[in-house]
Swiss-Prot record:
Source superkingdom: Bacteria
PANTHER family with a match to the protein in the record: GLUTAMATE-1-SEMIALDEHYDE 2,1-AMINOMUTASE, GLUTAMATE-1-SEMIALDEHYDE 2,1-AMINOMUTASE 1, CHLOROPLASTIC-RELATED
Broad EC category: isomerase
Family annotation (InterPro entries): 4pyrrol_synth_GluAld_NH2Trfase, Aminotrans_3, Aminotrans_3_PPA_site, PyrdxlP-dep_Trfase, PyrdxlP-dep_Trfase_major, PyrdxlP-dep_Trfase_small
Reactions catalysed, as given in the entry: (S)-4-amino-5-oxopentanoate = 5-aminolevulinate
Pathway participation: Porphyrin-containing compound metabolism; protoporphyrin-IX biosynthesis; 5-aminolevulinate from L-glutamyl-tRNA(Glu): step 2/2
Species annotation: Wolinella succinogenes (strain ATCC 29543 / DSM 1740 / CCUG 13145 / JCM 31913 / LMG 7466 / NCTC 11488 / FDC 602W) (Vibrio succinogenes)
Gene3D superfamilies: Aspartate Aminotransferase, domain 1, Type I PLP-dependent aspartate aminotransferase-like (Major domain)
Protein name: Glutamate-1-semialdehyde 2,1-aminomutase
PROSITE patterns reported in the protein's UniProt record: AA_TRANSFER_CLASS_3
Subcellular location: Cytoplasm
GO cellular component: cytoplasm
Length: 431
């Protein structure tokens, strides 16, 4: 597959953009080669600047539940643009989208919009600190909550420790109040509480999507709820990825556990830049101008983004549980086919499906936390990614990302991809 134009475009981009990309994973460093530069997309397919066509399982990293260039969402955006791009003033569209989300998520009594998931999680943590009057937070190895300084933390020694920055440019003092625990390990969380003089909140992806797809266990989620209740700490579900992806009511509906706050993004913007955080009324009342905790944004509640979000959520409501059942059946079909191919070619593989999300690891053992995810064969993943890209299948360019099914996909497309997986694994086996 020729990608001459993409190579030239990438080289040109590197002259004016650091690394040639505006988000590091897009540079293909983990898998090698040149990232395709995308010209256009429709439904389940991307088309690059060389005219190559790819079946897309990245879907802009999750927002596009209905696929690229969905007509209903596009129409809503076009109508909104006619009225103006941005006002910096309240609009009824903000209220409408807030009501749509609140109606579908138990426990979300009030919500505020931001322009990204990073802003949403950053603001939710600030609010939890303001509400509780405490400084420390607990997060988990392998859970990504955006690139705000306090959350760019890696593990020290032991099960749970005060965090160390995992990026240059983040002072130690910025992360000294961030404690790190092991995912799916309640004892490590208890140790964090013991180390702290006061935990404001526990934040996690209830279905982790940034160490590969690793769901929390039911026992773990219920245990966190109990611990937070006992300690007076705010439990925050980061549903930026799993919201309106894992199920009709997100991860909290799957587990039957209601957090005190939740953060959203991706799907609620229908492809436009949107984030949100919401929760109990007494917590949200601490936000300025009602309370003293400050949060703001020039483009927060942007009317074009709100229009896309309203159209997206209303389509989800129209599809209902049947929509999520169909998407999950496609994800299961894809992963079952993948497992059969891996067995045929004697390649170790672990797979996971939750709603319209799927993940796989080239790993001999099941994965339940970040440490286990790191045992995966990343060199094999890189070869597989390259082989699939050559066959016109666009996968996330890291072993530690999640794949997404969209509503424009069907069984015949999934079966086509399974055949390509078989070919790719056979090619890898030949060396």
């Amino acid at each position: 597959m020729e990608r001459i134009n993409s190579i030239n475009d990438f080289n040109e981009a590197k002259q004016v953009i650091p690394g040639g990309v505006n988000s590091p994973v897009r540079a293909f460093r983990a898998v090698g080669g040149t990232p395709p530069f995308i010209k256009e997309a429709k439904g389940s397919y991307l088309v690059d600047e060389d005219g190559n066509r790819y079946i897309d399982f990245v879907q802009s990293w999750g927002p596009l539940l209905f696929g690229h260039a969905d007509l209903d969402i596009q129409k809503a955006v076009e109508e909104a643009i006619k009225r103006g791009l941005s006002f910096g003033a309240p609009t009824t569209s903000e209220t409408l989208l807030a009501k749509e989300i609140i109606a579908l998520y138990e426990g979300i009594e009030k919500i505020r919009f931001t322009s990204s998931g990073t802003e949403a999680t950053m603001s939710a943590i600030r609010l939890a600190r303001g509400y509780t009057g405490r400084d420390d937070i607990i997060k988990f190895e392998g859970c990504y909550h955006g690139h705000s300084d306090a959350l760019l933390v890696q593990a020290g020694s032991g099960l749970a420790t005060f965090g160390n920055p995992s990026s240059p440019g983040v002072p130690q003092s910025f992360t000294k109040h961030t404690l790190l625990a092991r995912y799916n390990d309640l004892e490590s969380v208890r140790e964090c509480f013991k180390k702290s003089s006061g935990v404001a909140c526990v934040i996690l992806e209830p279905i982790a999507g940034n160490m590969g797809l690793v769901p929390a266990t039911q026992e773990f989620i219920q245990g966190l709820r109990k611990l937070c209740d006992e300690q007076g700490s705010v439990l925050i579900f980061d549903e930026v990825m799993s919201g309106f992806r894992a199920s009709f009511g997100g991860a909290q509906a799957l587990y039957g556990v209601i957090p005190d706050m939740a953060t959203f993004g991706k799907v609620i913007g229908g492809g436009m830049p949107v984030g949100a955080f919401g929760g109990r009324s007494d917590i949200m009342a601490c936000l300025s101008p009602e309370g003293a905790v400050y949060q703001a944004g020039t483009l927060s509640g942007n009317p074009v983004a709100m229009a896309a979000g309203i159209a997206s959520i209303r389509k989800i409501k129209q599809g209902g549980e049947a929509l999520f059942s169909r998407l999950e059946s496609l994800a299961l079909r894809l992963m079952e086919g993948f497992k059969k191919c891996a067995q045929k070619h004697q390649i170790p593989l672990q797979t996971t499906v939750r709603g319209s999300m799927f993940g796989f690891f080239f790993n001999h053992a099941p994965v339940s936390n970040f440490e286990e995810a790191l045992q995966s064969d990343t060199a094999l993943f890189a070869k597989f990614h390259q082989a699939m890209l050559e066959r016109g299948v666009y996968l996330a360019c890291s072993q530690f990302e999640t794949g997404f099914i969209c509503a424009s996909m069907d069984e015949s497309l999934v079966d086509e991809v399974i055949a390509k997986i078989d070919e790719a694994l056979e090619e890898i086996g030949r060396g």
